[in-house]
Amino acid sequence: MNNLATVLITISLLTGGTETVNFDVPIHEAVSSSDVQVEYEIAESDINYLAKTLYGEARGIEPKMEKAAVCWCILNRVDSDEYNFKDMKTIKDVVTAPNQFMGYNKDNPLVDELVDIAEDVLIRWRMEKDGVMEVGRVLPTEYTYFYGDGDRNWFRTDWRSKEFWDWSWDNPYEEDLNG
């Protein structure tokens, strides 16, 4: 017996247009209709802060999942109760905090690919906050630290930790090679 139902969400974006997301949810969490309309207002400033940070921190990094993980790391700090992040309650607070995301620069260009990744992650984050399971998060919530060398990014739960995220979750950005 299939215990999943497919849910369709159409999201209106402040940057214009809509995005439709299909995902499977456990039946006990599914609504009676398989066609659900939910509108998420994603602030253009939040998209821009993330995209400009990605430009400075991860623009040469492949795969896309690692770029998305930088956004999730930032959002993890926004949501964190950890003392180190007590004054960081917005995306702007996190990326402009002294000695944190050094790649953020207000003059960094807005590159379409990075804007798309930032917008996608913000939509997934909002869906998660609304109780949607399995939104395609690529980094666990406890990972609030990262560093990169221009080729790869490494994420950890403590800035002194020698243990890094192992990329064991599914990659929602993986292209279907079969069609």
Where are the model-predicted features located?
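N-terminal export signals and maturation junctions of secreted/periplasmic proteins
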Residues: 1-47
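Bacterial extracytoplasmic/cell-wall-associated proteins, especially those involved in peptidoglycan
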Residues: 30-31, 35-179
